[in-house]
Every structure is written in C-alpha cells, then in structure tokens.
Amino acid sequence: MIMASICTMAWVYGSVQGVGFRYSTQREALQLGVTGYARNLDDGGVEVLVCGEAEQVEKLIAWLKAGGPRSARVDRVLTEPHQPTRSWDKFAILY
C-alpha cells in the first residue's frame, strides 16, 4: 500500500528562538522520517516545512502544537497545505 505524500507549512510563535527549537524539530523530524526544513523568521517565529507520509507529517505538526521541546514555549501554530517548489531529501535547518 502506497501512503499519500503531503507537505504542510507551519509557522510557530512564542518563545521559540534561541532555545534549540529548530534543532529539536529536526531531531523529531528525522525520527518520524519526514523531510523539509526549519528556519527562524524576522518576526520571532519559526517557519517549518514538513513533507512525507500524511500520518507522519500530522505527528510532527501535533508535536509542534504540543509545545515542541521543553526549552520552548509555543503560543500558537498556524498551518496550511503547501506545494513545494523543490523536493527535500532530508530535514534541514535553514539560516
């Protein structure tokens, strides 16, 4: 059975910069087998692109909404389906 592959863009707000949020997100993504990236935004948030099997993508989004790493404080997570302009073969931290 082939699982559907999807991509979701998430924007995470709260105390999420300078607390290892991108690295923890990358570690969680690698465990789930999803690809994409995490990068800090100028407005203090973190942008996360997650691509992979729908169930695994949803698990990472749920992890983000649950607060991510203990060092962070997540106030809100906005998500929308995304059609990437390129494919990702790993989960990267962008600068």
Swiss-Prot record:
Domain Acylphosphatase-like: 7-95
GO molecular-function term, one example from the UniProt record: acylphosphatase activity
E.C. designation(s): 3.6.1.7
Catalytic activity line of the entry: an acyl phosphate + H2O = a carboxylate + phosphate + H(+)
Keyword terms of this UniProt record: Hydrolase
Matching InterPro entries: Acylphosphatase, Acylphosphatase-like_dom, Acylphosphatase-like_dom_sf, Acylphosphatase_bac, Acylphosphatase_CS
Pfam families in alphabetical order: Acylphosphatase
Active site, per annotation: R22, N40
First-tier enzyme category under EC: hydrolase
Superkingdom of origin: Bacteria
Keyword check for Hydrolase: yes
Family: Belongs to the acylphosphatase family.
HAMAP family found in the cross-reference section: Acylphosphatase_entero
Stated name of the protein: Acylphosphatase
